[in-house]
């Protein structure tokens, strides 16, 4: 079981990864809303915090996370999810190879 993580601005890449990982035989858990792609509900008071907490529960259920890091972009929320997953012994995979600093 794998949970997708990343900026919701990358909706198409989320959907592509979900399809590919599913066809590879994985159970895929994704985001519920794409806030950067027009889901206005995300920006109401308290909703983003609720969704962030809920996404950590999705990470708890998974064996690994798959980070949608288009162009190497990893935002603050995604970085927090990666740290959370790592602390909890989850494997972390990336759509694009990490850039060396």
Predicted segments with their positions:
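Conserved catalytic or regulatory cores that recognize and/or transform ribose-phosphate-containing ligands
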Residues: 1-101
């Amino acid at each position: 079981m794998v949970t997708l993580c990343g900026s919701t601005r990358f909706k198409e890449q989320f959907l592509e990864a979900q399809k590919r990982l599913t066809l590879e035989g994985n159970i895929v858990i994704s985001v519920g809303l794409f806030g950067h792609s027009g889901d206005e509900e995300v920006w109401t008071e308290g909703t983003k915090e609720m969704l962030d907490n809920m996404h950590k529960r999705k990470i708890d259920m998974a064996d690994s996370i798959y980070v949608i890091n288009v162009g190497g972009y990893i935002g603050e929320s995604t970085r927090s999810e990666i740290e959370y997953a790592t602390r909890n012994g989850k494997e972390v995979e990336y759509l694009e190879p990490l850039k060396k600093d």
